[in-house]
Protein backbone atom coordinates (compact mmCIF):
# COMPACT_ATOMS: atom_id res chain seq x y z
CA UNK A 1 0.00 0.00 0.00
CA UNK A 2 1.33 3.42 -1.00
CA UNK A 3 0.91 6.61 1.03
CA UNK A 4 1.60 10.06 -0.46
CA UNK A 5 1.50 13.65 0.85
CA UNK A 6 2.93 17.02 -0.09
CA UNK A 7 4.22 17.58 3.44
CA UNK A 8 6.29 15.07 5.38
CA UNK A 9 4.45 15.77 8.64
CA UNK A 10 1.11 14.99 6.99
CA UNK A 11 2.45 11.58 6.05
CA UNK A 12 3.77 10.91 9.53
CA UNK A 13 0.49 11.99 11.14
CA UNK A 14 -1.77 10.28 8.56
CA UNK A 15 -3.66 13.55 8.18
CA UNK A 16 -6.48 14.30 5.78
CA UNK A 17 -3.93 15.99 3.51
CA UNK A 18 -2.38 12.62 2.64
CA UNK A 19 -3.87 9.89 0.48
CA UNK A 20 -3.30 6.20 0.04
CA UNK A 21 -3.69 3.56 -2.62
CA UNK A 22 -5.84 0.49 -2.42
CA UNK A 23 -4.01 -2.61 -1.27
CA UNK A 24 -2.03 -3.96 -4.21
CA UNK A 25 -1.76 -7.74 -4.32
CA UNK A 26 1.35 -8.90 -6.14
CA UNK A 27 4.15 -11.46 -5.89
CA UNK A 28 6.57 -9.25 -7.85
CA UNK A 29 8.97 -6.70 -6.30
CA UNK A 30 7.20 -3.83 -8.04
CA UNK A 31 3.64 -2.61 -8.51
CA UNK A 32 1.83 -0.06 -10.64
CA UNK A 33 -0.49 2.40 -8.92
CA UNK A 34 -2.96 4.64 -10.71
CA UNK A 35 -3.38 7.54 -8.31
CA UNK A 36 -6.70 9.19 -7.59
CA UNK A 37 -4.92 12.54 -7.38
CA UNK A 38 -3.12 14.01 -10.39
CA UNK A 39 0.41 15.18 -9.76
CA UNK A 40 0.93 18.94 -9.79
CA UNK A 41 3.82 20.76 -11.40
CA UNK A 42 6.74 22.05 -9.31
CA UNK A 43 5.69 20.08 -6.24
CA UNK A 44 7.59 17.83 -3.83
CA UNK A 45 5.78 14.64 -2.85
CA UNK A 46 6.62 12.47 0.15
CA UNK A 47 5.82 8.77 -0.04
CA UNK A 48 5.93 5.64 2.04
CA UNK A 49 5.11 1.99 1.32
CA UNK A 50 3.73 -0.65 3.68
CA UNK A 51 4.12 -4.27 2.61
CA UNK A 52 2.65 -7.40 4.19
CA UNK A 53 3.33 -11.08 3.77
CA UNK A 54 0.53 -13.31 2.49
CA UNK A 55 -0.77 -13.91 6.01
CA UNK A 56 -0.94 -10.15 6.72
CA UNK A 57 0.56 -10.90 10.12
CA UNK A 58 3.91 -9.29 9.38
CA UNK A 59 4.50 -5.95 7.69
CA UNK A 60 7.43 -3.82 6.62
CA UNK A 61 7.18 -0.01 6.64
CA UNK A 62 9.60 1.79 4.35
CA UNK A 63 11.40 5.00 5.31
CA UNK A 64 9.76 8.17 4.02
CA UNK A 65 11.25 9.24 0.70
CA UNK A 66 10.38 12.01 -1.74
CA UNK A 67 10.38 13.04 -5.37
CA UNK A 68 9.78 16.38 -7.05
CA UNK A 69 7.87 17.22 -10.21
CA UNK A 70 8.96 19.88 -12.70
CA UNK A 71 6.98 21.49 -15.52
CA UNK A 72 4.41 18.83 -16.42
CA UNK A 73 2.50 20.86 -19.00
CA UNK A 74 3.50 23.34 -21.67
CA UNK A 75 1.01 25.79 -20.17
CA UNK A 76 3.01 25.78 -16.91
CA UNK A 77 5.73 27.90 -18.52
CA UNK A 78 5.42 31.64 -17.93
CA UNK A 79 8.67 32.42 -19.76
CA UNK A 80 8.90 32.94 -23.51
CA UNK A 81 11.58 32.04 -26.06
CA UNK A 82 14.12 34.85 -26.36
CA UNK A 83 17.24 35.65 -28.40
CA UNK A 84 19.00 38.80 -29.58
CA UNK A 85 18.20 40.94 -32.64
CA UNK A 86 20.63 39.25 -35.06
CA UNK A 87 19.75 36.77 -37.79
CA UNK A 88 20.87 33.15 -38.08
CA UNK A 89 23.92 33.97 -40.21
CA UNK A 90 25.49 36.27 -37.62
CA UNK A 91 28.27 34.16 -36.08
CA UNK A 92 29.01 35.65 -32.60
CA UNK A 93 27.10 33.76 -29.90
CA UNK A 94 24.15 35.52 -28.21
CA UNK A 95 24.67 36.55 -24.60
CA UNK A 96 21.70 37.29 -22.34
CA UNK A 97 21.42 38.51 -18.75
CA UNK A 98 18.72 39.32 -16.22
CA UNK A 99 19.26 41.19 -12.95
CA UNK A 100 16.73 40.68 -10.16
CA UNK A 101 16.35 41.20 -6.42
CA UNK A 102 15.87 38.29 -4.01
CA UNK A 103 14.82 38.61 -0.39
CA UNK A 104 16.25 36.82 2.64
CA UNK A 105 15.02 33.52 4.13
CA UNK A 106 14.96 31.51 0.91
CA UNK A 107 13.66 27.98 1.38
CA UNK A 108 14.40 26.69 -2.10
CA UNK A 109 14.89 27.81 -5.70
CA UNK A 110 14.52 25.84 -8.90
CA UNK A 111 15.59 26.83 -12.41
CA UNK A 112 13.93 25.27 -15.45
CA UNK A 113 15.73 25.97 -18.72
CA UNK A 114 15.72 24.90 -22.36
CA UNK A 115 17.56 26.17 -25.41
CA UNK A 116 17.94 25.59 -29.11
CA UNK A 117 20.52 24.39 -29.36
CA UNK A 118 22.79 24.73 -26.29
CA UNK A 119 23.08 26.99 -23.27
CA UNK A 120 25.90 27.85 -20.91
CA UNK A 121 24.09 29.41 -17.95
CA UNK A 122 25.44 31.03 -14.81
CA UNK A 123 23.95 32.50 -11.66
CA UNK A 124 26.04 35.29 -10.15
CA UNK A 125 28.99 34.26 -12.29
CA UNK A 126 28.98 30.60 -11.27
CA UNK A 127 27.87 27.82 -13.58
CA UNK A 128 24.61 26.12 -12.67
CA UNK A 129 25.88 22.74 -13.92
CA UNK A 130 29.15 20.93 -14.52
CA UNK A 131 27.82 19.28 -17.69
CA UNK A 132 28.01 20.66 -21.22
CA UNK A 133 25.98 20.57 -24.44
CA UNK A 134 22.62 20.91 -22.70
CA UNK A 135 19.90 20.14 -23.58
CA UNK A 136 19.99 17.07 -25.82
CA UNK A 137 19.33 17.13 -29.56
CA UNK A 138 15.78 16.85 -30.91
CA UNK A 139 13.90 17.91 -34.02
CA UNK A 140 13.52 21.39 -32.63
CA UNK A 141 10.33 22.28 -34.47
CA UNK A 142 8.57 19.34 -32.79
CA UNK A 143 10.04 18.89 -29.34
CA UNK A 144 12.47 20.61 -26.96
CA UNK A 145 14.05 19.09 -23.87
CA UNK A 146 14.63 21.06 -20.69
CA UNK A 147 16.65 20.69 -17.49
CA UNK A 148 15.86 21.43 -13.86
CA UNK A 149 18.45 22.74 -11.40
CA UNK A 150 18.46 23.34 -7.66
CA UNK A 151 20.04 26.80 -7.39
CA UNK A 152 19.11 27.51 -3.77
CA UNK A 153 22.70 27.77 -2.54
CA UNK A 154 23.74 30.15 -5.35
CA UNK A 155 21.18 32.85 -4.63
CA UNK A 156 22.14 35.99 -2.75
CA UNK A 157 20.10 38.38 -0.67
CA UNK A 158 19.78 41.50 -2.84
CA UNK A 159 20.87 41.68 -6.48
CA UNK A 160 21.34 38.47 -8.45
CA UNK A 161 22.21 37.96 -12.12
CA UNK A 162 21.11 35.07 -14.31
CA UNK A 163 23.01 34.93 -17.60
CA UNK A 164 23.38 32.64 -20.59
CA UNK A 165 25.56 32.16 -23.66
CA UNK A 166 23.83 30.25 -26.46
CA UNK A 167 25.47 27.84 -28.88
CA UNK A 168 24.41 26.79 -32.38
CA UNK A 169 24.67 23.01 -32.01
CA UNK A 170 22.50 21.18 -34.52
CA UNK A 171 19.93 23.99 -34.43
CA UNK A 172 21.87 26.51 -36.50
CA UNK A 173 24.47 24.69 -38.59
CA UNK A 174 26.08 26.50 -41.49
CA UNK A 175 28.06 25.38 -44.54
CA UNK A 176 30.67 24.12 -45.25
CA UNK A 177 30.87 22.10 -41.98
CA UNK A 178 27.16 21.29 -41.58
CA UNK A 179 26.14 17.64 -41.30
CA UNK A 180 23.16 15.82 -42.82
CA UNK A 181 22.30 19.03 -44.75
CA UNK A 182 21.23 20.64 -41.46
CA UNK A 183 22.16 24.04 -42.88
CA UNK A 184 18.83 23.61 -44.71
CA UNK A 185 16.92 22.23 -41.70
CA UNK A 186 13.36 23.48 -41.38
CA UNK A 187 14.05 24.59 -37.80
CA UNK A 188 17.28 26.49 -38.46
CA UNK A 189 17.40 29.88 -36.77
CA UNK A 190 19.38 32.08 -34.41
CA UNK A 191 20.01 30.28 -31.06
CA UNK A 192 17.36 31.01 -28.42
CA UNK A 193 16.34 29.97 -24.92
CA UNK A 194 13.45 29.81 -22.48
CA UNK A 195 13.80 29.67 -18.71
CA UNK A 196 11.93 30.12 -15.48
CA UNK A 197 13.18 30.35 -11.91
CA UNK A 198 10.82 29.84 -9.00
CA UNK A 199 11.97 31.01 -5.56
CA UNK A 200 10.06 29.78 -2.52
CA UNK A 201 10.55 31.77 0.69
CA UNK A 202 10.17 30.38 4.19
CA UNK A 203 7.04 32.50 4.74
CA UNK A 204 5.33 30.71 1.83
CA UNK A 205 5.67 33.54 -0.71
CA UNK A 206 6.88 32.73 -4.22
CA UNK A 207 8.87 34.80 -6.71
CA UNK A 208 9.22 33.94 -10.39
CA UNK A 209 11.91 35.19 -12.76
CA UNK A 210 11.39 34.17 -16.37
CA UNK A 211 12.70 34.86 -19.84
CA UNK A 212 11.00 37.84 -21.48
CA UNK A 213 11.72 41.05 -23.37
CA UNK A 214 13.35 42.71 -20.32
CA UNK A 215 16.53 40.63 -20.60
CA UNK A 216 19.66 42.46 -21.80
CA UNK A 217 21.52 41.07 -24.82
CA UNK A 218 25.02 41.38 -26.23
CA UNK A 219 27.74 39.42 -27.99
CA UNK A 220 31.20 38.75 -26.63
CA UNK A 221 34.27 36.54 -26.99
CA UNK A 222 32.59 33.55 -28.69
CA UNK A 223 32.82 34.90 -32.23
CA UNK A 224 32.07 31.57 -33.92
CA UNK A 225 30.91 28.13 -32.78
CA UNK A 226 30.12 24.88 -34.54
CA UNK A 227 29.23 21.45 -33.18
CA UNK A 228 32.09 19.85 -35.13
CA UNK A 229 34.69 22.55 -35.79
CA UNK A 230 34.56 23.97 -32.25
CA UNK A 231 34.68 27.54 -30.94
CA UNK A 232 36.60 30.62 -31.96
CA UNK A 233 37.21 32.62 -28.78
CA UNK A 234 38.60 36.17 -28.72
CA UNK A 235 39.49 37.03 -25.13
CA UNK A 236 39.79 40.71 -26.06
CA UNK A 237 36.00 40.79 -26.50
CA UNK A 238 35.19 39.40 -23.05
CA UNK A 239 32.88 41.69 -21.06
CA UNK A 240 34.16 41.80 -17.48
CA UNK A 241 31.39 41.43 -14.90
CA UNK A 242 28.62 40.78 -17.44
CA UNK A 243 27.39 37.75 -15.51
CA UNK A 244 27.77 39.22 -12.02
CA UNK A 245 25.84 41.68 -9.82
CA UNK A 246 26.92 45.30 -9.96
CA UNK A 247 27.66 45.34 -13.70
Annotate each predicted stretch with a short phrase.
Residues 1-44, 50, 54-60, 77-81:
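Recognizes extended acidic, P/S/T-rich segments that occur
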Residues 4-6, 26, 35, 84, ...:
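Surface-exposed beta-strand edges and flanking loops
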Residues 43-48, 53-55, 68-73, 87, ...:
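Accessory beta-strand-rich segments of carbohydrate-active enzymes
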